[in-house]
């Protein structure tokens, strides 16, 4: 197993993706609307990027600014469309009104990902109780944080 850090770059479209790969990116995180901390790209965008580059892609599943799941059925539809467009890895994370993991939403969305790897995205940064979140998500292989090391939060035990 390589100890080399993975360079992940945000891509909003095909041009970004091609430039990132040419610049040495190992992996892309595909999003739209960075002003909202990244939302789901369209299935057409994912398919276009998948055709244009040959590095790993992680695709955002989030429909609105903030970390509330919102319309879970729509999230499930979008996740399925992204999967059909060639997405094989995902980032997602939903909190309820109290700032705790919205497990029902997470489980519904993950249920349509056909076993694809996924990362609990930056919702942890806004969680009311990070220790409780970690326990709720026991077994999740990866968390993505903004500005804080995972070891500082004792995410992994």
Regions found by a protein language model. Name each.
Residues 15, 34-55, 69-76, 94-114, ...:
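Active-site-adjacent beta->alpha loops and helix N-cap segments on the catalytic face
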Residues 21-28, 53-56, 86-89, 112-116, ...:
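Glycine-enriched alpha-helix->loop->beta-strand junction motifs that scaffold or abut catalytic
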Residues 6-19, 23-24, 29-30, 37-38:
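N-terminal beta1-alpha1 ligand-phosphate binding loop
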Residues 1-4, 49-67, 115-116:
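N-terminal small/glycine-rich loop or linker at the start of catalytic domains
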Residues 5-11, 28-30, 57-63, 90-92, ...:
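Hydrophobic faces of well-ordered beta-strands that scaffold small-molecule active sites
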Residues 12-23, 59, 63-84, 125-141, ...:
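Catalytic cores of alpha/beta
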Residues 20, 49, 82, 109, ...:
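Conserved, mostly hydrophobic/aromatic
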């Amino acid at each position: 197993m390589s100890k080399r850090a993975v360079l992940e770059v945000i891509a909003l479209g095909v041009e970004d993706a091609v430039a990132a790969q040419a610049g040495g990116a190992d992996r892309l995180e595909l999003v739209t609307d960075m002003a909202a901390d990244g939302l789901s790209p369209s299935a057409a965008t994912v398919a276009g990027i998948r055709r244009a580059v040959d590095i790993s892609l992680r695709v955002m599943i989030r429909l609105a600014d903030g970390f509330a799941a919102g319309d879970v059925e729509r999230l499930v539809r979008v996740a399925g469309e992204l999967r059909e467009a060639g997405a094989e890895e995902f980032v997602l994370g939903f909190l309820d009104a109290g700032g705790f993991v919205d497990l029902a939403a997470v489980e519904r969305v993950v249920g349509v990902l056909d076993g694809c790897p996924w990362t609990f995205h930056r919702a942890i940064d806004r969680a009311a109780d990070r220790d409780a979140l970690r326990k709720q998500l026991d077994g999740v292989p990866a968390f993505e944080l903004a500005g804080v090391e995972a070891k500082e939060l004792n995410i992994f035990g």
